[in-house]
């Protein structure tokens, strides 16, 4: 059986409901040469009796079997990562250029994003011993991948608008 015919497993603890089994064809710069073969939204593997959570799963295949390195995240965390991504992209597009090192060393907090009656702090990780170099590399990667990211952001914006957000 060729890999493109391989289906995401349904007999494991994560129970797929919605799948993208051809994700390997669109996995950014790794398209067609990735071990990430699919994505799914389904019932979380950690569900307790009477409590059902939705999770997103990244399915990786080693060539012989589905990898234990496949990642599963609760759906709200996927959205929180999208929020963190969007706020970070906005920061690097509109604010980071103002600072010689790409961030304000005295005030590394970028934003406080309101969620659930509290807020998620978005900040440059100044605990990282190589943060100046890593910010530079991060900015270069954002620049290099601008077209890939932009395509996904436009699609996300379009879908959110279509959904009434």
Please place each PLM-identified region on the residue numbering.
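Long, hydrophobic, amphipathic alpha-helical segments used as structural scaffolds
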Residues: 89-99, 146-153, 164
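Short, small-residue-biased leader/transition segments that mark boundaries at the very start
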Residues: 1-3
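Elongated alpha-helical scaffolds
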Residues: 76-87
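A short, structured beta-strand/loop element
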Residues: 36-72, 93, 100-115
